[in-house]
Amino acid sequence: MAKKTAIGIDLGTTYSCVGVFQHGKVEIIANDQGNRTTPSYVAFTDTERLIGDAAKNQVALNPQNTVFDAKRLIGRKFGDPVVQSDMKHWPFQVVNDGDKPKVQVNYKGENRSFYPEEISSMVLTKMKEIAEAYLGHPVTNAVITVPAYFNDSQRQATKDAGVIAGLNVLRIINEPTAAAIAYGLDRTGKGERNVLIFDLGGGTFDVSILTIDDGIFEVKATAGDTHLGGEDFDNRLVSHFVEEFKRKHKKDISQNKRAVRRLRTACERAKRTLSSSTQASLEIDSLFEGIDFYTSITRARFEELCSDLFRGTLEPVEKALRDAKLDKAQIHDLVLVGGSTRIPKVQKLLQDFFNGRDLNKSINPDEAVAYGAAVQAAILMGDKSENVQDLLLLDVAPLSLGLETAGGVMTALIKRNSTIPTKQTQTFTTYSDNQPGVLIQVYEGERAMTRDNNLLGRFELSGIPPAPRGVPQIEVTFDIDANGILNVTATDKSTGKANKITITNDKGRLSKEEIERMVQEAERYKAEDEVQRERVAAKNALESYAFNMKSAVEDEGLKGKISEADKKKVLDKCQEVISWLDSNTLAEKEEFVHKREELERVCNPIISGLYQGAGAPGAGGFGAQAPKGGSGSGPTIEEVD
C-alpha cells in the first residue's frame, strides 16, 4: 500500500525542485544526476523522450524538439501578447489550436503537438519519480506552487498538469507563501513580523509582503514581473557575445540556432561563475564555421549589460510596499528566493534600498519554495510533528474579481489581495422595466472598466418575473476556495431561482475528456520510455558481451590453451555481432537478446572448455563465464531478462 507521504513541488519556469517532510524535517531530494534542482525541459528525439538534465544537455543538438518555458504558455491563449512575444525567442514551434497554444515537435519521426499542460505534466512526472526513487514507494499526494501573479486560468491549468502526471494535487499555493513557510519554520520569533520576499528566478520575478504572527501567515501584497529572470540576463550576455563575434570575425551567428544555443549554455555558466568571481571565461570550440570562440567577461561588464533589468527589480518592491501600506522601515525581514538572487549586484541594490538592512540568505534560494511546499503538504496530510502543528496559511487573491454593471463598469466583489478562501455577497437589480433576465459577466483585474479587464466567464439568470426596473433583487455570491478556484452564484430572491458558474476557465481550460486522454497518453509515453530503456539495456548487454568475449580469447595468457580454430570461430562471430550492432542500433530488444543467445551458443562451449578443471581464470580474468561449469569464481555476467 502506498504510504501516506505527500511531496512539495516547485514547478519552475526553468528549473523545478521537490521536497518531502519526514522525521520532523524537510529533505530536498536530489535527482539521478545528484542535482537538487532539475531543468524544466522535455526533449523529443527519433528514439525517445528525455526529461530534465538529459533533455537540457542535448539541447544544442536538438533545439527544435527541446521544449522549455512551458510555464510561460500554461493557462494562456495563443493570441496573448506574452505568448506572441515569447515565441520569437523559442527555437521550438508553437502552433494555434482554437486559440490554445500547442508545442509542435518531431517525435520518433512524426510530428506531434502537445498542450503546455502536457509538457508541464511530464516535468511533474519526473519530479514525482525523483521522490519515489528516494522514498522507495509510490507517491500521489502533492502540493504544487505557482507565482503569486498567476490568474485563475493559469492555476487551473497547473492543477490539470498535476492530474495528468498522476498526482492528487492537495493544493496549489503561491511561491512566496511557500518560501514564507520555509522561513516561518526556520524562525519562530514572537510578535508580528513583516517579511518581504524577493523572488528572482529563472523566468519570473515576484515580490510579496507577508505578516507572520504566531504561526499565522498573511499575504499583504504581491507585485512583480511575469517576465523577468535569469534567462533575461542570459539573453543580454548572448547579444553581447554575438556582437563581439561579429566584430572579431565579421560573421553573424544569430541565425544559427545551434551556435546560439551553445553560446547560451556557456553564458549561463559564466553568469553563475560571476556570482562568486569577478571574471569568467568562455571557451567554445568550433562555434560557427569552424571558428573557436575564446573570450572572457568581467562582473562589472555583466552588471553594466543588465543594469536596467537589475534596477527595474526595485519598482515592484515599491509597488508592493504601497499596496501593503507599509513604509520600508516597517519591514522586519528581507528574504531572498530564486537562483538569480545570488547575483551580488541584485543583493546590493536591494540592501541599499532598505538602507543597508541585512538580507536573509539562510535558506538556499533555489530550494526555499519546494521546502515550504513540502511543509504545507505535510500539514494537509495531518502531520502531527510539533514543527508544523501551529502553522496556519492564509493566501490571497492575486487580482480583484467582480462583475460588469450598467455602462461596462467593473464592480469588484473580491478585492485584490483579499485573504482566501473567501465568500462575498452583494445584491444587484435590473436596469430596465420588465427585464426578463440578467447576464452575469465575471471579470478579473484592477481597471475601472471591464473592457480593460480579463473576462473569466459569463452566465444568464433568466425567468425573472416582470417588474419595474430596480425592483427585482438578484443576490450574487463570489466564493473562492483555498486553491483560488472561483464559484459565482446568482439567485433571484423573489423566485429562489438560481444559476451558477465555476470559473475553471472557458478560456483555455482542458475538458475532463482531454485530461483523461492526456493521463492515458502520459501512461503510454511512460511505457514507451520503459521499453526504450529495456531495449538500450539489451543492446548494451550484447555489446559488452561481444567485446568481453573478443578480449577474452585474445588474452595473451591463453596462448596454447585455445585452438586457433576455436579462437577464430569466437572472433569471427564477435566481429559479425559487432558489425551487426553498428548497422542495427535501432533494433528491438528481442533481436538483441536473440543475437546474444546466438553468440553464447558459439562462445560458451569454447570458454567453459577452458575452465574445465582449470580453476579460476588466468591473468586478466574473463568478463564472462559460462553460466554452467567453471569453478564458480571469477566475475559472471547475468542474462538480461
Swiss-Prot record:
It is found in: Cytoplasm; Nucleus; Cytoplasm, Cytoskeleton, Microtubule organizing center, Centrosome; Secreted. The keyword Nucleotide-binding applies. Residues 2-386 are annotated as: Nucleotide-binding domain (NBD). One of its GO terms (molecular function) is signaling receptor binding. Residues 394-509 are annotated as: Substrate-binding domain (SBD). ATP binds at residues 12-15, 71, 202-204, 268-275, 339-342. Its main location: cytoplasm. InterPro entries: ATPase_NBD (IPR043129), Heat_shock_70_CS (IPR018181), HSP70_C_sf (IPR029048), HSP70_peptide-bd_sf (IPR029047), Hsp_70_fam (IPR013126). GO terms for cellular component: aggresome; apical plasma membrane; basolateral plasma membrane; cell body; centriole; centrosome; COP9 signalosome; cytoplasm. Keywords: Acetylation, ATP-binding, Chaperone, Cytoplasm, Cytoskeleton, Methylation, Nucleotide-binding, Nucleus, Phosphoprotein, Secreted, Stress response. Residues 618-633 have a biased composition (Gly residues). The modification Omega-N-methylarginine is found at R469. The keyword Transport does not apply. The modification N6-acetyllysine is found at K77, K108, K246, K348. The modification N-acetylalanine is found at A2. The modification Phosphoserine is found at S631, S633. The modification Phosphothreonine is found at T636. GO terms for biological process: ATP metabolic process; binding of sperm to zona pellucida; cellular heat acclimation; cellular response to heat; cellular response to unfolded protein; chaperone cofactor-dependent protein refolding; chaperone-mediated protein complex assembly; defense response. It comes from the Eukaryota. Residues 618-641 are annotated as: Disordered. SUPFAM superfamilies: Actin-like ATPase domain, Heat shock protein 70kD (HSP70), C-terminal subdomain, Heat shock protein 70kD (HSP70), peptide-binding domain. Molecular chaperone implicated in a wide variety of cellular processes, including protection of the proteome from stress, folding and transport of newly synthesized polypeptides, activation of proteolysis of misfolded proteins and the formation and dissociation of protein complexes. Plays a pivotal role in the protein quality control system, ensuring the correct folding of proteins, the re-folding of misfolded proteins and controlling the targeting of proteins for subsequent degradation. This is achieved through cycles of ATP binding, ATP hydrolysis and ADP release, mediated by co-chaperones. Component of the CatSper complex. Identified in a IGF2BP1-dependent mRNP granule complex containing untranslated mRNAs. Interacts with CHCHD3, DNAJC7, IRAK1BP1, PPP5C and TSC2. Interacts with TERT; the interaction occurs in the absence of the RNA component, TERC, and dissociates once the TERT complex has formed. Interacts with METTL21A. Interacts with DNAAF2. Interacts with TRIM5 (via B30.2/SPRY domain). Interacts with PRKN. Interacts with FOXP3. Interacts with NOD2; the interaction enhances NOD2 stability. Interacts with DNAJC9 (via J domain). The N-terminal nucleotide binding domain (NBD) (also known as the ATPase domain) is responsible for binding and hydrolyzing ATP. The C-terminal substrate-binding domain (SBD) (also known as peptide-binding domain) binds to the client/substrate proteins. The two domains are allosterically coupled so that, when ATP is bound to the NBD, the SBD binds relatively weakly to clients. When ADP is bound in the NBD, a conformational change enhances the affinity of the SBD for client proteins. Belongs to the heat shock protein 70 family. This is Heat shock 70 kDa protein 1A. It comes from Rattus norvegicus. The gene is Hspa1a.
